[in-house]
Swiss-Prot record:
Main location: plastid
Source species: Triticum aestivum (Wheat)
GO cellular component: chloroplast thylakoid membrane; photosystem II
Entry keywords, A to Z: Chloroplast, Membrane, Photosynthesis, Photosystem II, Plastid, Reaction center, Thylakoid, Transmembrane, Transmembrane helix
One Gene Ontology biological process: photosynthesis, light reaction
Compartments, record wording: Plastid, Chloroplast thylakoid membrane
Residue intervals passing through the bilayer: 5-25
Protein name in the entry: Photosystem II reaction center protein M
Record's function text: One of the components of the core complex of photosystem II (PSII). PSII is a light-driven water:plastoquinone oxidoreductase that uses light energy to abstract electrons from H(2)O, generating O(2) and a proton gradient subsequently used for ATP formation. It consists of a core antenna complex that captures photons, and an electron transfer chain that converts photonic excitation into a charge separation. This subunit is found at the monomer-monomer interface.
Encoding gene (name): psbM
Subunit and partners: PSII is composed of 1 copy each of membrane proteins PsbA, PsbB, PsbC, PsbD, PsbE, PsbF, PsbH, PsbI, PsbJ, PsbK, PsbL, PsbM, PsbT, PsbX, PsbY, PsbZ, Psb30/Ycf12, at least 3 peripheral proteins of the oxygen-evolving complex and a large number of cofactors. It forms dimeric complexes.
Length: 34
């Protein structure tokens, strides 16, 4: 089974970018509430 590196990177970015974006918004919201 051959793994396509570009497909793997694209999938990783597609998952990590929105997750990190939501995480940053969450942290900012929590810090503002305090």
């Amino acid at each position: 089974m051959e793994v396509n590196i570009l497909a793997f990177i694209a999938t990783a970015l597609f998952i990590l970018v929105p997750t990190s974006f939501l995480l940053i918004i969450y942290v900012k919201t929590v810090s503002q509430n305090n």
